[in-house]
Amino acid sequence: MHERDLRFKLPDPVFAVPEQQRELSWGGDALVAARGIGQFIRVLLPVRLSGGYEVRYGTWLSVSEKEARRTWETWDQASYLDLEISGFLANAIPPWGKALLGAQARARVRKQDELPYVVGSSNELLARVLSEEWPHEDVLDTFPNPA
């Protein structure tokens, strides 16, 4: 299986605010809270591709304050393995773009040392993205070329 990862640095709603105006209440590589915008948890969105490929998008879920706090409290604990998160995709994922932005998503931890994986959705398109195989050229051609 060939694998490739693409990570979004920030959730789209945070990235849309000019850097000098962003007020991050707290955050890091996996958890971010932005004053007046919301709380976000980094998750992995796996996409199966033709030819035995897989791509994982390091994307963000917009979550409630309660969900963010619960996640933060369990992040480095043994109970992290039992963590399930509900939220909404906070990035436009290529090639589907804004059609996935705001899609309801459920994520679950697979391994103690990994980010939670998106495992389900009530959104029809996101459910298809998770369950179907996609032409690898259509997806990988949307990735930025490494310089």
State what each model feature region is.
Residues 14-17, 32, 43, 47, ...:
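Extended aliphatic helical segments
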Residues 1-50:
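Basic, glycine-/proline-tolerant helical and adjacent loop/strand elements
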Residues 16-23, 55-58, 133:
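Surface-exposed beta-strand edges and their flanking turn/coil or helix-capping segments
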Residues 74-147:
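C-terminal, charged low-complexity interaction regions
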Residues 33-101:
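Long amphipathic alpha-helical segments
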